[in-house]
Amino acid sequence: MIINLQELIALLPFLILLLTVVIVILSISYNRNHFFIAFLTIISLIVSLCSLYFLIAIVPIDITSLFHITKRSILYISMIIISSIATCVFAYPWLLKYAFNKEEFYLLTLISTLGAIFLTISNHMASLFISVELMSLPIFGLIAYSNSQKYSLEASFKYLVLSGVSSSFLLLGISWIYAISGNLSLLCLNQIFSDLSNSEKMMVLFGIIMVLMSFFFKLSMVPFHLWTADIYQGTPASVLSFFSVSGKIAIFSILLYFFSYFSVFDNKVIFLILSLISFFSILFGNLMAIFQTNIKRFFGYSSISQIGYLLIILLVSKDEYFFSVQTGGIFLLNYLCTNIVYFGVINLFSNSCDYDIDSIHLYKGLFWVQPLLASIVTIVLLSLGGIPITLGFFGKFCIFSIIIKNHLWTIGASFLIGTILGLYGYLRLIVNMYLNPSEQSFINDIKKSNFWLCSPSGILIFISGIMLLILGIYPNPLINLINSVQ
């Protein structure tokens, strides 16, 4: 296999991260230095993000038959890297509490980031499976990094077992597809499917459904959602900002790429499965979030409904594909920014108070002590609810347009009911922050966070929150950016 110069340039962002992984391993082996490894990891992620600019002129390009890089995949890779940067920034002050094994956190984050990136550009079932495993395996360690807390160990063990079951479904589906079609290329699958007999089509369809079931588990969709709340509760907040975003962006991007060749509209079985899962995920996620008192569990159920909205984008005809990609980019950017803010805030206060601030009632009266931070959290919650002048409203408006254009009336009903239920849940959190503080709130312990905006975590939270407002009021730059990557 010979890789030419152009392909080498296309691999530059990934080679930078691979080189960083090697340096981090050597540094851990010979001379541990937490600050150096954290700084090196963040800088390498930023350099890798900037190097994506050089790919714009040479894409689309194939790197062997395993990977296919497009402008659209560059957009999703950018989001994944930004999520990784946020995770490393949030994790540094949190890891200072640990006497040992701080540096391995950044190694696991880099490896998982590489897996998510490779999944985004996968063009073959073999690279897809390896990328999913490369992305998932380090997450087991990240979830259990607070090994002194039983909830973290329990969450890691649950995710390990259930992820193994998910991987077995993925491998079964891939094997079934290959046994019938003799080809594992995502690009050729639709053509192969159309050339098969009806009985062979049913068997390939079974394999595709197995693959989708594995992805739905990773996306925590109903009915594969039962692990979500427990694992969100047990996972450290700094890890959640990565766990909740990068994998879901990568998996959604590969689903969007797959269905660009294998139209959902052309197969009633796939269309029905996606419709039902989207319908119940929206309703169940928003309904269960209302009854939560733990803020991590709340956002766990909220993520189920948010990805349920996102699945609607896949239920379009080929004529609407361009608009669905545009909508997906807007919605995922909103999802990225909101996750960075609210998990960043939880991490910020947990570090300041030396205990987990994960109960909703602990945030009562936050506005009267930290008005700017409470205002940013308010913007985030309103954006998740789809209130005007936020980016979330624009994303939901585009999804509602897809529902109308494609006559998805049943999904539309769940969309409206889910939005109302979601608004109730988000407004409950907002009102809680503006009430008078109670004795149970952590207001007395918050003094150390008075200068939160001067910290790297605070700057990241502030920028992400303000972006939701600016792009909600003036979304044209974002629309032009997404249109340019089509």
UniProtKB/Swiss-Prot annotation:
Compartments it resides in: Cell membrane
The UniProt record lists the keyword Nucleotide-binding: no
Record keyword NAD present: yes
Chief place where the protein resides: membrane
GO cellular component: plasma membrane
Record-listed E.C. numbers: 7.1.1.-
Membrane topology, as annotated: Multi-pass membrane protein
GO MF term list: NADH dehydrogenase (ubiquinone) activity; NADH:ubiquinone reductase (non-electrogenic) activity; quinone binding
Any Pfam family the entry gives: Proton_antipo_M
Gene Ontology terms describing biological process: ATP synthesis coupled electron transport
TM regions (residue ranges): 8-28, 36-56, 74-94, 104-124, 125-145, 160-180, 204-224, 239-259, 270-290, 298-318, 329-349, 374-394, 407-427, 459-479
Record-linked InterPro entries: NADH-Q_OxRdtase_suN/2, ND/Mrp_TM
Class in the EC hierarchy, top level: translocase
Family assignment from sequence similarity: Belongs to the complex I subunit 2 family.
HAMAP family reported in the protein's UniProt record: NDH1_NuoN_1
Entry function: NDH-1 shuttles electrons from NADH, via FMN and iron-sulfur (Fe-S) centers, to quinones in the respiratory chain. The immediate electron acceptor for the enzyme in this species is believed to be ubiquinone. Couples the redox reaction to proton translocation (for every two electrons transferred, four hydrogen ions are translocated across the cytoplasmic membrane), and thus conserves the redox energy in a proton gradient.
Quaternary organization: NDH-1 is composed of 13 different subunits. Subunits NuoA, H, J, K, L, M, N constitute the membrane sector of the complex.
Protein name: NADH-quinone oxidoreductase subunit N
Organism listed in the record: Buchnera aphidicola subsp. Schizaphis graminum (strain Sg)
Taxonomic classification: Bacteria, Pseudomonadati, Pseudomonadota, Gammaproteobacteria, Enterobacterales
